[in-house]
């Protein structure tokens, strides 16, 4: 019998672990809820405000026959849930409510009435994990020991009365594409629940999320109408929120939100715990440019979390709460005829008791657009279509109706141009859309979301300071007639310019309210929170690691190397550390070149930095090419239990690296190609292959 090497043993252990996981359904471990996620109240959250966690009681109290649950990390699933609720109400007369999965308990789902329906709109986060607000529900419903109030076992089909609808939001560049909705659907089917229509899946990786959603929902509504005896009617706009102007208050009134994220911030007394619902206003203590070319920017920033009680671990993410650019705020207010009253105070209230107001209130039109609404995002065909009834003239109405009904035409005129809502409407007419209710804009646009960045420092080395590394987005995409500018990275560039002595920062022609609402961010501050990641160094520092991180994908690996250098300086044994780094040109965008050179001198042969420069010669060289060239080294380190890490572009680089690694394993061991692929999959399941990727 051939002798087993270490990687083979790792694979066997992974198979054993996988088998235990399968048969125990995770009894011995579970998806970890983000330790930094807040358990505090969200604005107008019914259950979180101390009210019932019994969803059936809530539906009975409020006269609802349709609940739409969402599991959302960035706000998209929540937006889709709200859109489904609105459409169900307006087109089919359903009494709908939107519900955050973490607001309720689920032991009484076996008593769900037959004449009601539950929707589940679930995003898959990271490596096939539930979003933070869906962790507890997911653990409950998929658990082997799931127990309902009736005491019925899974074999007795306790959810036979439950009618449900599912839609998943995923990304096909990730290994576990739409795992959440698939696993939930299987669990509900096993428990006897009746799915209405197909289990929908949207693919952000292919850029078809919106069209996948639109294509799925029409046959779903048909199936639901048949199952529940619904009659479609002409959809007429019915506001979810009541927006009123308050002439008794001015923008200077201390009770008016001018961009403050919470009541504590409004009152000038922000208190922790700081989280995704309550950011810390952190000082930026250092900011500098990493590129040496003038037409592109990459920022290094040091953000202090001293005194906040925020903590992080090497490999975690930091969330930056952005501000919309002044030019886009002005454009939006002009398009909707709000420029003259931008500083008027408005109150926003939910017409239905279950409606959650996404914006702090009272506020102003300007503050809502600048700090709270995602006005720069690509606009959806469905939302554009909803504005037809409020068009300034018949010709514009006809054009909007065509855009709404013809997906190819919409793709040509709007999607290809990467237009946001204001740009899209400006491309149709110069007349303002003054008749559009502001409530419709709040309903149709997402809340402005924090953007996440891989932390590029070690918590062991600087526990009170977080480093971030970010390329500033200002690119002309194929087909677009204008530069597409990143919301957060250009905001950060403006802060860097101001900190470094430029009196009037205007990155790529944009200006920002740098000092924040009521000058509360003066002195170069930015709102942040920390999010836990499973992207971690081995607990044993003597274990080898292989890191693949081109461009800003090197960010977490700077932290990894920083930490290993600190451990080595303390006399600890540090395993072989290999970094595959790629960029265009060593003299233009080789990030942290001098730092890495110093670490190489300190760590000697234990640190190997292997570079790939794509534009130095006529032949483009990428990290996957260097990986293949170093096949023997990679194979040897895997035999020594090396952990393999990838950070960066999911759509191309990460896929290529995954493929090349499988080929290396197969070739170096004389195995069939499919065996190499299988071994990489087992490395993933055992945690010895980790990704921090984006598309």
Curated annotation (Swiss-Prot):
- Is the keyword Methyltransferase in the record? no
Query: Can you supply a Gene Ontology BP term from the record?
Result: ergosterol biosynthetic process
Residue ranges of the Flavodoxin-like domain? 66-221
Topologically, how does it sit relative to the membrane? Answer: Single-pass membrane protein
The protein's matches in InterPro entries, at most eight in alphabetical order, are given as: CysJ-like_FAD-binding, FAD-bd_FR_type, Flavdoxin-like, Flavodoxin/NO_synth, Flavoprot_Pyr_Nucl_cyt_Rdtase, Flavoprotein-like_sf, FNR_nucleotide-bd, NADPH_Cyt_P450_Rdtase_alpha
Q: Name one GO cellular component term.
A: endoplasmic reticulum membrane
GO terms, molecular function: flavin adenine dinucleotide binding; FMN binding; NADP binding; NADPH-hemoprotein reductase activity
Q: Which Pfam families does UniProt cross-reference here?
A: FAD_binding_1, Flavodoxin_1, NAD_binding_1
Tell me which UniProt keywords the record has, alphabetically: Cell membrane, Endoplasmic reticulum, FAD, Flavoprotein, FMN, Lipid biosynthesis, Lipid metabolism, Membrane, Mitochondrion, Mitochondrion outer membrane, NADP, Oxidoreductase, Steroid biosynthesis, Steroid metabolism, Sterol biosynthesis, Sterol metabolism, Transmembrane, Transmembrane helix
Annotated residues for binding of FMN: 72-77, 123-126, 169-178, 204
How and how many cofactors are bound, per the record note? Answer: Binds 1 FAD per monomer.
Binding annotation for NADP(+): 296, 552, 614-615, 620-624, 656
Its EC top class is oxidoreductase
Which catalytic reaction applies to this protein?
2 oxidized [cytochrome P450] + NADPH = 2 reduced [cytochrome P450] + NADP(+) + H(+)
Q: Which Gene3D superfamilies match?
A: 3.40.50.360, NADPH-cytochrome p450 Reductase, Chain A, domain 3, Nucleotide-binding domain of ferredoxin-NADP reductase (FNR) module, Translation factors
Residues that, per the record, bind FAD: 451-454, 469-471, 486-489, 694
The role this protein plays is: This enzyme is required for electron transfer from NADP to cytochrome P450 in microsomes. It can also provide electron transfer to heme oxygenase and cytochrome B5. Involved in ergosterol biosynthesis.
What name does this protein carry? NADPH--cytochrome P450 reductase
Species assigned in the record: Aspergillus oryzae (strain ATCC 42149 / RIB 40)
